[in-house]
A protein has these predicted regions:
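Active-site and adjacent substrate-binding regions of carbohydrate-active enzymes
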Residues: 1-542
Length: 542
């Protein structure tokens, strides 16, 4: 691992793991921490630097663990605290870090705090949540899950009051106006940091506080508390990071970086749909537009970028017309849609076209930001739109070609979810073992791309310039730091593009560092780019 005090997260490769889906070590049909430990060598060989764990806490699993019933323990089907400590130890021994989800905004309604709170108005936990005698407060706050929730308030018969929830009614919001809640969250942070983890992905951070007359998002009180948490981390765990989930426009996310004293990293949500939009339209305008709206951030901060994750491909930050376009092109079946988004994985979104998958990865790795890979997307796994809600993109990892995909020795009736069984995404066609054997596989392409990114630190923190190509279908980016530079070209079209380039420097003949075939003489501005081709030229070739 990089040394303490370094900005390690700026040049890291993050890998998102849903423990339940990864590998079942004890034959109960559920992935577990011991199973993940057995697969750490696989992640190390791929080139992963940091593992992000979805929630591992005890939970009724109405929202796949984001409804926490105990912040100080591990879901029994995943293992126990000792298993978690061993995971962290083994990951660190392989040079990989571990961060876990910190669900700050809400708990499960099964949490003992909420059960005590609803039982009596004099309970010390009553003020851990937001209660009201009316459901008319905070009317300007939007409803996030419009598919299932009609209000942000839910009536509790036992409490005799309404409680506030920004997500599902089974997830009551914590009351951060209560100093005891603020201190409790710091205790939780200390508990897990003392086990050696390297930070947290802070879930749903814009919604911590409520104020009448506002939309109850991005409030000054929220930023003040997050800065307090950051100062606490910096004092006690200076190498740890906070990665924020703020599904907002880049200019609204900017304050979450503070002056480099709030969150270390934030997801860049609006980029994800525009990568797919640009690809389908075969034009770079959506990408140019979103990067023009992306402000500069403090030097010690970083954006996190991604092609897909465990949720739907969110279309909250597109116009209604763009949303209809995305649904029409990428989710023609209503089962593929969820809330304001698309519940599909990377490979099915692009019809399993390996050229387009590789192009998307190349853009992700050459554009500004730290990339995150969602488990299974490194081999092009499929989805199951027949499963409920977001479960369709959370199916078992496919390790081999067996009917169980090598995920579990349990009978299929005990699996937490079925393995993808229909071509072209069934285990016989998509699995880790096969792709490791084949040098031309998506796995090996991505492994090569990861190695290239690490060999080119200018991609992590260097200057970014967008180069005119003379073609609306070809996006080109120049990344430079000190005397090192890398120039990446991406053809979004399904036809050959002849482009004209004027580079910031003239160096003579260059060779593509991805495949080593295409050459370009920078003294000659003309270049022919094949359909969906991606090329990287660099003066830093090892």
């Amino acid at each position: 691992m990089s040394p303490k005090g370094s900005l390690w997260y700026k040049n890291a490769i993050f890998y998102e793991v849903y423990v339940r889906a990864f590998y079942d070590s004890n034959g109960d049909g559920h992935g577990d921490l011991a199973g993940l430990i057995q697969k750490l060598d696989y992640l190390q060989n791929l080139g992963v630097d940091c593992i992000w764990l979805l929630p591992i806490y005890p939970s009724p699993l109405r929202d796949d663990g984001y409804d926490i019933a105990d912040y100080y323990n591990v879901l029994p089907t995943y293992g126990d605290i000792n298993d978690f400590k061993e995971l962290v130890r083994q990951a660190h021994a392989r040079g990989m870090r571990v961060i876990t989800d910190l669900v700050m905004n809400h708990t499960s309604d099964q949490h003992p705090w909420f059960q005590a709170a609803r039982s009596s108005r004099t309970s010390p936990y009553r003020d851990y949540y937001v209660w009201s005698d009316t459901d008319q407060k905070y009317k300007e706050a939007r409803i996030i899950f419009l598919d299932t929730e009609k209000s942000n308030w839910a009536w509790d018969e036992i409490a005799g009051q309404y409680y506030w929830h920004r997500f599902y009614a089974s997830q009551p919001d914590l009351n951060y106006d209560n100093p005891a809640v603020q201190e409790e969250m710091k205790k939780i942070i200390r508990f897990w940091m003392d086990m050696g983890i390297d930070g947290f992905r802070a879930d749903a951070v814009p919604y911590l506080f409520e104020r009448e007359g506002t939309d109850c998002e991005n409030l000054p009180e929220t930023h003040a508390y997050l800065k307090e948490v950051r100062a606490f981390l910096d004092q006690h765990y200076p190498d740890a990071i906070l990665l924020g989930e703020a599904n907002q426009w880049p200019e609204d996310v900017l304050p979450y970086f503070g002056n480099g004293d709030e969150l270390h990293m934030n997801f860049h949500f609006p980029l994800m749909p525009r990568l797919y939009m640009a690809l389908k339209k075969e034009e770079k305008t959506p990408l140019e537009w979103v990067f023009e709206r992306t402000p500069a951030i403090p030097e010690n901060c970083q954006w996190c970028t991604f092609l897909r994750n465990h949720d739907e491909l969110t279309l909250e930050m597109v116009t209604p017309e763009e949303r209809e376009f995305m649904w029409r092109e990428y989710a023609p079946d209503p089962k593929m849609r969820l809330n304001l988004g698309i519940r599909r994985r990377l490979a099915p979104l692009v019809d399993n076209d390996q050229r387009r998958i590789r192009l998307l990865y190349s853009m992700l790795f050459s554009f500004p930001g730290t990339p995150i890979i969602y488990y299974g997307d490194e081999i092009g796994m499929g989805d199951n739109i027949e499963l409920f809600d977001r479960n369709g993109v959370r199916t078992p990892m496919q390790w081999d070609a067996s009917p169980s995909a090598g995920f579990s020795a349990a009978p299929p009736s005990r699996w937490y979810a079925p393995v993808i069984s229909t071509p072209p995404f069934d285990p016989q066609r998509v699995n880790v073992a096969d792709q490791i054997r084949r040098s031309d596989s998506l796995y090996h392409f991505l492994k090569h791309l990861i190695a290239l990114r690490k060999a080119h630190p200018e991609l992590a923190s260097g200057e970014t310039r967008w180069i005119d190509t003379g073609s609306p279908s070809v996006v080109a980016v120049w990344r430079a730091e000190s005397d090192r530079w890398l120039f990446a070209i991406h053809n979004l079209a399904d036809k050959v593009q002849e482009i004209n380039l004027t580079l910031p420097v003239v160096t003579g003949e260059l060779t593509d560092v991805i495949e080593g075939r295409l050459t370009f003489n920078s003294k000659d501005s003309r270049l022919k780019v094949q359909p969906y081709q991606t090329v990287w030229f660099s003066n830093n070739v090892k």
